[in-house]
Amino acid sequence: MRLSEFHLHTTKEIPADAELVSHRLMLRAGMIRKLASGLYTWSPLGLRVLRKVEAIVRDEMNRAGAVEMLLPTIQPRELWEESERWEKFGSQLLKIKDRKQAEYCYSPTAEEAVTDYVRQELTSYKQLPVNLYQIQTKFRDEIRPRFGVMRAREFVMKDAYSFHLSDADLVREYENMRATYTRIFTRLGLEFRSVQADSGAIGGDASQEFHVIADSGEDVLAFSTGSDYAANIEAAIAATPGPRLTAKETLQKVSTPTQKRCEDVTALLDIPLQRMVKSIAVMTDSGFFLALLRGDHTLNDIKLSRLPGLANFRLANEVEIARHLGSEPGFLGPVCPGMSIRIIADCEVAVMADFVVGANEVGFHLVGVNWGRDLPEPEVVADIRNVIEGDRAVDGGKICIARGIEVGHVFQLGRKYAEAMKATVLDEYGKAVTMTMGCYGIGVSRIVAAAIEQNHDVAGIIWPAPIAPWQVAVCVINPKKDPVIIAAAELLLAELQSADVDTVLDDRGLRPGVMFADMELIGIPHRIVVSERGLAAGTYEYRARRTAMVENLDKTTLLTRIKA
């Protein structure tokens, strides 16, 4: 490949709305160009990277026994009504009509289409299990597309769906896919974590997310120093706290005239934030509750919503708070003599003693509060908080917190879609049995951006070698000055290509500084300079992109270094 024959257009200009490093660098490197909000054209350079990601994903899926197929991106309303997702999916589902006014959607996911295919094609248990996958463009009508291809409306995804006769067989394939995803992200050269996760809108019985570790990640991850335990912050748990502490203080009411925030109250009282208990007023289908958390902890909405009767909880408003407690936010507390207030205490709060709470009186808090003496034992004790850095993990290690970009997700869907769409096969006794399903997705185009978020410096992208557009760039200084120079470069190019090293020849005749800056920006792992001075000395200048190490090497040593 010669750059003089390749469309490469880099730029120094960055749009004001390009917030993430990956968005800025993909634009500067000429990998993508914006067509409309959330819609991007992939240039020849960007497509080379995208195709390399696809190739690794496809290779490992095939190795795992999955079979590739291709489903329509435009799908009929009737199919989505069978699964009851035509309305439930919400405004992200792009709906369209054809000339006959028949309604369709642009597929954001393909559970319905693949289930329809399978229920027509599979009739016997002897045809199971099967795992079908595709690599296809999807569309979600994001209300505010941002971050370039990280959260675009149109994106490339690998989605796979497995069908089974039994739950045990589904679990086996689920574990097969988890192992496959680990191989995929390892081959991509990325630092990643596999974490326990909530199944979200797709639903299902068990799920695991795969995250690329990056400071810019939107997801918060918790993992242990003691084992491979890792979870999304929504699902992460800490070790069960020890026994309740012994009460030593008496109850007192103290003035906190302007202090509403936990941090301000504890600063005024000169006590640790961990001694504060904050009260969060919530409304549920069964009435008013106070959810109690330690002062340095935050509420985990998902954990709270999973408690009996709290699936539809919401935060109480000021009118509701005044009606139930006669107070206002900032001074709420669970000590309510003469009133029957229902309390949900986080596990950590349930073992506290001598803690501080709001007095349900503006300008006052209570100190030295203890269970059983100053307020009744909580109606519910449960884990309703987010874990924090330094928590004791369930395996005895310490919890560490990092940010991640979700690039893969595996689900055990169960029979949710198969039951809704009547997808059955005959078992060995001739009885119709509903199939059980697994779902396995990878954000192919998102991986490209995530890789950049994890691998870059001030000069540009530093691609992991497996997905770089080229492994080696041979840069020619003054190619038109002396035919010997270009001949030597072409010979080196041929030798590298014959050794299956993906190589590009930069024969554009640009100034060295401009040429080198381009190669650093687009992230080529190895740069070789062919120059008149180097040839006279029998050497080539070699530079490793990741380490910035520069050496003058003879050809034999150079080729050995590149192939290593």
UniProtKB/Swiss-Prot annotation:
Cellular component GO terms, alphabetical: cytosol
* Cystine crosslinks: none
Which Gene Ontology BP terms does the record give? Answer: prolyl-tRNA aminoacylation
Q: Which GO terms describe its molecular function?
A: aminoacyl-tRNA deacylase activity; ATP binding; proline-tRNA ligase activity
Among SUPFAM superfamilies, the record links this protein to:
Class II aaRS ABD-related, Class II aaRS and biotin synthetases, YbaK/ProRS associated domain
Give its E.C. classification number.
6.1.1.15
Q: Where in the cell is it found?
A: Cytoplasm
What is the reaction catalyzed? Answer: tRNA(Pro) + L-proline + ATP = L-prolyl-tRNA(Pro) + AMP + diphosphate
Keywords in UniProt for this one?
A: Aminoacyl-tRNA synthetase, ATP-binding, Cytoplasm, Ligase, Nucleotide-binding, Protein biosynthesis
Q: What is the enzyme's class at the highest EC level? A: ligase
The protein's job, in short, is:
Catalyzes the attachment of proline to tRNA(Pro) in a two-step reaction: proline is first activated by ATP to form Pro-AMP and then transferred to the acceptor end of tRNA(Pro). As ProRS can inadvertently accommodate and process non-cognate amino acids such as alanine and cysteine, to avoid such errors it has two additional distinct editing activities against alanine. One activity is designated as 'pretransfer' editing and involves the tRNA(Pro)-independent hydrolysis of activated Ala-AMP.
Protein family membership: Belongs to the class-II aminoacyl-tRNA synthetase family. ProS type 1 subfamily.
Q: Reproduce the free-text note on domains from the UniProt record.
A: Consists of three domains: the N-terminal catalytic domain, the editing domain and the C-terminal anticodon-binding domain.
Q: How does it assemble?
A: Homodimer.
- The entry's protein name is Proline--tRNA ligase
Record lineage: Bacteria, Pseudomonadati, Pseudomonadota, Gammaproteobacteria, Lysobacterales
Q: Which gene encodes it?
A: proS
